[in-house]
Amino acid sequence: MTAVAANPTKIGGHGPPLQGMIIRDAVEADLPAIVEIYNAAIRGRISTAQLDPVSIDERLPWFREHSPESHPLWVDEIDGQIAGWLSFHSFITRCAYRGTAEISVYVSEKFRRLGLGRVLLEKAIAHSSHLEINALVGRIFGHNEPSLRLFERLGFERWGFLPRIARVDDVERDLVIVGRHISAQA
C-alpha cells in the first residue's frame, strides 16, 4: 500500500477539518508511537485484555509479523504525528482460515471522536479483497459501546458472545466477536 491522503474535510462528520492526514504502512520507526497509543488503551481498560503496559522491545516481534502483502499494519498520520493504527493478523493459523483476518484499531486519545477509527476501518474493508481476505473479525469487550457501534455501522454483525470471559481489575467482562464478509468489489 502506498500512502493515501485523506480528503481534507471533516472526518466522519465530526470536529474540525483535518489537513495532512495520510494512511500508510507502518515502519519500525513508528513503533514507539504505536506502543504509546496501545499503552494508553491498556490504562483505559476498555479496549484490550492486556493489563500491563508493553515495551517497544516486547512489541517488536508482533510488529515484524505484519506484512503489507498479507497482514498489513497501517498508521494514520496527521501532520507528522501518528494519530492511530490498524492491524490485520491471522484469525486462526490453520489453512482453512487463511481468508479470514482479525483486525484491531486503536486511536490516540488526542485524536478520538474525529472519525479516524471509521476512516481506518473503511480502508481495511476496501483493501481486504486485495489481500485475498473474504472475512474480517474483531474481538470487542461488551462494555466498549463506541467500538461496537462503529463496527456495526460499517456492516459488522455480532457473530459470537462469550460471557464473563475476561477478568479486568476484578471485574468480569464479556467479549463480543463481530464479523463481516467481504465481497470481491469491496
What are these regions (language model features)?
Residues S128-I140:
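Conserved GNAT acetyl-CoA-binding A-motif
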Residues A6-N7, G12, P16-G20:
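Short, low-complexity intrinsically disordered segments enriched in A/P/G/S/L with frequent Arg
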Residues D25, D52-K110, L121-E122, H127, ...:
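Acetyl-CoA-dependent GNAT
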Residues A101, R164-A186:
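C-terminal "cap" of GNAT-fold acetyltransferases
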Residues R113-A126, E145-R153:
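Conserved acetyl-CoA-binding loop-helix of GNAT-fold acetyltransferases
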Residues S87-S90, V137-I140, E152, E157-D174:
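Conserved catalytic-core motifs of GNAT/GCN5-like acyltransferases
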Residues V35-W62:
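Conserved GNAT-fold acetyl-CoA-binding loop/helix
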Residues I22-I34:
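A short beta-loop-alpha structural element at the N-terminal edge
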